[in-house]
């Protein structure tokens, strides 16, 4: 999971890019990068760390130019090496930099094609560098000194023909402008908007609408599946459908966990979707246990708060904040490595005994993935004096790996894989476990008149929308990307890139 942003402005965009990445920090805390363009020269700064740590004053002063792109990263493919921080760069044609959110499922085939047919070299294990080289090659074969929007859209069409998976991309073509595009299934989110200044109109492309809001941009719309937007350095905007058979199937887990609640994705309010998740959970509890003895509903900060509030309201039960969060600790789900996650939970949360002592407590979380967080939190609730500890997941059981850019690649690291609800309840130490039903989740997110064909719910139902994911592929990525393998692969690769200081 990553966050991307691109801006075409009328003055230096370094501060705006920095601010946008800070707003998107929840999408990745492993690395950050910004590249800008001024007088056909590129200025890059990227490294491991949070946005505030990667960019010091001296770096910001060097990032000059009215056009630029940025990225925050959590690694799902490749490694956590700073060599794989984005944006990536290739010098031919034109000098192209690229930032990518998602994951390609045919990356091995593409890497082979790039080397044997396109005669290009890829220096890292990142599928983002592969995607960049595919785009660069398809633009190079147009053989134009000055590429037009038609050339750029033709190159994006070829990317769609060759690349399979979920991807949202923003790329900067030196001296020309920025291009954003979305995979033909619209799995990963991307939006664009504009703001009016005294010097003219400025444009932004970003992963989430909240980045536009905070910086004073007006949301124009989401990119459609397979669509591309090209904005020239002069501020001319072009859009084009570049996929042959687009299908609207965005990832439903964005609404469950990944996105900020104040974002609008594909015309859907994330906040409103989470309110409805709480309503659906309450209805299920009232159906299955109309005589429940829940005394208080307590959310696990922060994502579950919206659903928990509506759950309590619909049940007619008190809602209380029972945990104090240390806001200087990152999100545990997107922390590399199980050991880091376990250590982080106790550092991040502390129970308020007053809210637990002698009560039947219903804890609410957005989802249960590995079970690391909820198991420790349930134990904390018991230590704080809870009489009974019940647990509610606003999402259905996560039973299958995600292959489109979320860090759930290994099925055997998912606590619900091949286990019943009762099994999971025992493993996490809950007296009662309630999962959201998948039809209810789909209705909560997509209820009403929306343009979506269907959601990608692969982590819940094992149905992968790209149609190329089989057992052999899942076994291969499990071996390549489980926590044990990641721990062994953190050797630092050489950085072959722009001067980076």
UniProtKB/Swiss-Prot annotation:
Its cofactor is Mg(2+). It catalyses: 5-phospho-beta-D-ribosylamine + L-glutamate + diphosphate = 5-phospho-alpha-D-ribose 1-diphosphate + L-glutamine + H2O. GO terms for cellular component: cytoplasm. Keywords: Glutamine amidotransferase, Glycosyltransferase, Magnesium, Metal-binding, Purine biosynthesis, Transferase. Pathway: Purine metabolism; IMP biosynthesis via de novo pathway; N(1)-(5-phospho-D-ribosyl)glycinamide from 5-phospho-alpha-D-ribose 1-diphosphate: step 1/2. Pfam families: GATase_6 (PF13522), Pribosyltran (PF00156). Its EC number is 2.4.2.14. Transmembrane segments: none annotated. GO terms for biological process: 'de novo' IMP biosynthetic process; purine nucleobase biosynthetic process; purine nucleotide biosynthetic process. The active site is at residue 2. Mg(2+) binds at residues 303, 365-366. The keyword Metal-binding applies. Binds 1 Mg(2+) ion per subunit. Catalyzes the formation of phosphoribosylamine from phosphoribosylpyrophosphate (PRPP) and glutamine. NCBIfam families: purF. This is Amidophosphoribosyltransferase. The gene is purF.
